[in-house]
Amino acid sequence: MQGLYIKSYGCQMNVYDSLIMENIIKPLGFTVVNEPSEANIVILNTCHIREKASEKLYSELGKMRKIQETKDLTIVVAGCVAQAEGEQIFARAPFVDIVVGPQSIHTLPELIIKARRMKKQVINIDFPIISKFDAIPVEEYTKNQEVSAFISVQEGCNKFCTFCVVPYTRGEEYSRTVEAIFNEALVLSDSGVKEITLIGQNVNAYHGTYKGCEWDLGKLIQYLAKIPNIERIRYTTSHPRDMHQSLYEAHRSETKLMPFVHLPIQSGSDRILKKMNRKHTAEEYIDIINNLRKQRPDIAFSSDFIVGFPGETEEDFEHTMKLVQEVNFSQAYSFKYSPRPGTPSAEYPNQIPEEIKSQRIFRLQELLREQQLAFNRNMIGQTCSVLFNNKKGKFDNQIIGKTEYMQSCYINTDNTNQFYNSILPIKIIDAYQNSVTGIVVN
């Protein structure tokens, strides 16, 4: 058997795609290895959202080249950088053998055979008529899942935010059929999966037709909740413009749907939101938050923020800080704006100096850290439902799980196998910045 090494960058969709690539390549005679030095094929599944992610690729490729100089190694660049840069990757890193876009990964076995037999570079960054989901049997992307699993229900984006490359790298919005999603969930359930996370670039833009009716994400969630062994359902990443009434209703009535929503806003300034082409206001975002809290009072929120968008004034930034204070997030992700080639905002005037970006991101992250720590500390003394999905904690006698609110929860135990793949009531006894600790409630 030859070795296969896959490294994923970025979003959950890339993790999902990496699993697909692993399962369709292994029948060619490969086994997964933990180190690139042990591999005969290395796949770097890339992200293109931020400038540093692209540069990380070329840094990693330099390491792969050194390995390639000592052995027969096929180097594959997959994912969104592959889609965006295409042939430019060969020009910048001529030792790369294969470039494949995220919508063409189902052709990877063919590309590998072609590249290795013909000793030539090959590329496929097409947006094929037949989607990768139609080309790959469901069994190939449900293998090797454990306690929690992703299910891709939607890909692509039609929103065209001015800072974002996703519409150009993932293509237009595409929703899988209800039957395909349900069948995948059934296979996962039969294999022991207890928690599914429905993923998509704009997951709540999901739409389909089934049994003569129109379906959206809320209706899909309530249908999947009927699968007996699936005990938890999550979804990510959502967009404020696609919050439909059925999704509110699902949060109110479906106990399997976890009380946690990742809902990016990017900025609290209406002026900046307009320049970003988000097509919603800060007030509309707050209304969504309040409506979700009305349906599920214990719900927690995370979000994404971009600091230093072109033309952002101090007043604009203060609007963001005000929104953060009003919502009170349990966790959030914040980034300094970095211009992505080919996006409208890369050409905007009034680019913000790095020094100002750094000052603002420090202030924002300080506030977000305060909120996250306060949220975690507020859990002390409460009993949470925790799914233990990781056998390895910081120490040998620990096991890690996730609360309903996506907090990492550690417990001490001499037998990690006893709790693995279990959902247990845990009394929280201590809290930290990024985690909580607890004890099992008898």
From Swiss-Prot:
Pfam families: Radical_SAM (PF04055), UPF0004 (PF00919). SUPFAM superfamilies: Radical SAM enzymes (SSF102114). Residues 2-117 form the MTTase N-terminal domain. Binds 2 [4Fe-4S] clusters. One cluster is coordinated with 3 cysteines and an exchangeable S-adenosyl-L-methionine. Its main location: cytoplasm. Belongs to the methylthiotransferase family. MiaB subfamily. NCBIfam families: miaB-methiolase, MiaB/RimO family radical SAM methylthiotransferase. This is tRNA-2-methylthio-N(6)-dimethylallyladenosine synthase. It comes from Ehrlichia chaffeensis (strain ATCC CRL-10679 / Arkansas).
